[in-house]
């Protein structure tokens, strides 16, 4: 098969190598991506992780949030700074699919084509959804006569439809997804600040939009530039070049954001952890959502505080304290043990479900991994994907938040499409301890990637994407707990009609 021969770095040619360096890309990372593309092209089967069983409440793979004493956790919450971390660089192409004919017509300054596109939108019920103000202005202009559409209005329509999804209206009043997320963070309280990952060159636009929401919470913006991207490759494995001989970069998946986590500490020096949610998942601030989120945060802080004490005891080789603290963590999460059980072994094998070969020799390695709390919402019986499972990852039985591309067809039918087995799924509701550079480096060789096949410039190209929630949600790389949270925290907006005709008050209670 074409692409089975490994390509060497120097096969790129000096010009391509210079372009990669000038784009601030790490050539060793791009080379690794290239080898993965070649591996995928050479393989007859997609890379999958065989599933032993799903994680469920009944088998301890998923846990319920414990009730904590507020007096105990108040100080810990103050000591453990958490920053909201929101990936928001994604385009809105899928969300705005019904508006593409209007966008194309506005780009051509074709008022008649705009009128046809708007008529179709009205027939499809799109005009009742949250839309940019320019579309309503355009509709007024069209009703007044097609000759009255100005170039400025055409430009405004193009600019607003072509905006990143974060800046798009989420409610009828026009408040954007970014504004709603900021309001949610404001109402939640207890956060050090918030960071939004935005497209290249759009940080000023994001900052301007965030400033429309009055809040003492500091907002920071990190642009997802070429250093977080990968390259497109031909089926031969060679770097794909455009008609001008230039390389073509493309986002390398949310997993590429992982190296950004240490930067959170640079922006917020007191930060210990991040709270990750998607920009287009609106939770609102109902009492159910706020209480569940605070409980989630409190349990994370309590557990991380005890893990810190565990690390301190390990540094002093204090086995008495180690066993006592380990038992305290088990008690919080309701893990019962026998008197003969070693609390440390039980902590990692029965709570974190990770591989323990020998104690206490394994302890430093296990404690070096970040603590991750990954929320899981009940499955409506129609949700497939983002399922937490016990799987074979490179020969080890591991707890894993698995994505559909890494599931065989048989396992998909037996586990993911079986509502009795796939009882919960990942809504992207995650609190993760900020990892050190050693752990970031360890993730460089992770197996949680896939190769996307896309049409580009009239030909098929391939590129690697890393899957963040498999990386954070694997028991080999993190001390991860899957925890049930209410379905109310999960309201994704994947199409315009998901927004419906909702007003701001539907989500944010004053």
Each language-model region and where it sits:
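Extended, charge-enriched "interface" segments that sit outside catalytic cores
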Residues: 25, 29-54
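Non-transmembrane, aqueous-exposed alpha-helical and coiled segments at domain scale
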Residues: 3-21, 27-28, 74
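Domain-scale recognition of functional cores that engage charged ligands
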Residues: 46-380, 390-400, 406, 493-495, ...
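OB-fold and OB-like single-stranded nucleic-acid-recognition modules
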Residues: 319, 327-510
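Residue-level detector of intrinsically disordered, flexible termini
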Residues: 2-3, 270
């Amino acid at each position: 098969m074409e692409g089975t021969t490994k390509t060497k770095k120097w096969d790129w040619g000096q010009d391509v190598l210079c372009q990669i360096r000038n784009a601030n890309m790490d050539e060793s990372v791009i080379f690794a991506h290239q080898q993965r593309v070649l591996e995928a092209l050479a393989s007859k089967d997609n890379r999958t992780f065989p599933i032993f069983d799903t994680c469920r409440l009944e088998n301890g793979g998923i846990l319920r949030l414990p009730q904590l004493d507020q007096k105990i956790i108040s100080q810990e919450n103050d000591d453990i700074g958490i920053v909201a971390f929101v990936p928001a660089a994604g385009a809105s192409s899928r969300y705005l699919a019904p508006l593409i004919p209007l966008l194309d017509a506005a780009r051509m300054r074709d008022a008649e084509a705009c009128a046809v596109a708007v008529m179709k939108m009205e027939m499809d019920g799109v005009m009742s959804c949250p839309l940019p103000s320019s579309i309503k202005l355009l509709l007024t202009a069209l009703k007044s006569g097609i000759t009255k559409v100005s170039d400025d209005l055409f430009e405004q329509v193009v600019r607003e439809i072509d905006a990143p999804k974060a800046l798009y209206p989420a409610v009828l009043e026009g408040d954007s997804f970014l504004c709603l997320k900021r309001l949610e963070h404001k109402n939640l309280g207890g956060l050090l600040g918030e960071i939004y990952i935005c497209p290249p060159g759009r940080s000023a636009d994001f900052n301007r939009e965030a400033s429309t929401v009055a809040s003492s919470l500091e907002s920071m913006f990190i642009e997802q530039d070429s250093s977080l991207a990968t390259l497109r490759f031909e089926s031969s494995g060679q770097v794909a070049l455009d008609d001008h001989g230039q390389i073509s970069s493309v986002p390398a998946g949310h997993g590429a954001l992982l190296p950004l986590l240490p930067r959170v500490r640079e922006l917020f020096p007191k930060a210990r952890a991040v709270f990750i949610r998607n920009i287009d998942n609106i939770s609102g601030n109902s009492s159910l959502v706020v209480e569940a989120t605070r409980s989630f945060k409190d349990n994370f802080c309590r557990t991380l505080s005890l893990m810190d004490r565990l690390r301190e005891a390990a540094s002093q080789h204090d086995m008495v304290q180690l066993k006592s603290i380990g038992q305290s963590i088990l008690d919080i999460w309701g893990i019962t043990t026998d008197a003969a059980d070693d609390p440390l072994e039980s902590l990692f094998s029965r709570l974190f479900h990770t591989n323990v070969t020998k104690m206490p020799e394994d302890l430093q390695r296990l404690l070096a991994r970040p603590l991750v709390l990954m929320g899981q919402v009940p499955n409506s019986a129609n949700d497939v994907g983002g399922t937490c499972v016990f799987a074979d990852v490179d020969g080890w039985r591991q707890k894993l938040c698995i994505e559909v591309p890494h599931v065989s067809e048989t396992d998909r039918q037996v586990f993911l499409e079986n509502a009795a087995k796939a009882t919960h799924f990942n809504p992207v509701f995650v609190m993760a301890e900020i990892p050190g550079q050693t752990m970031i480096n360890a993730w460089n060789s992770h197996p949680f990637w896939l190769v996307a096949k896309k049409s580009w410039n009239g030909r098929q190209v391939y590129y690697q994407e890393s899957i963040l929630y498999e990386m954070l949600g694997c028991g080999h790389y993190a001390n991860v707990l899957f925890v049930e949270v209410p379905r109310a925290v999960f309201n994704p907006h994947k199409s315009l009609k998901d927004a419906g005709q909702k007003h701001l008050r539907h989500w944010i209670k004053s």
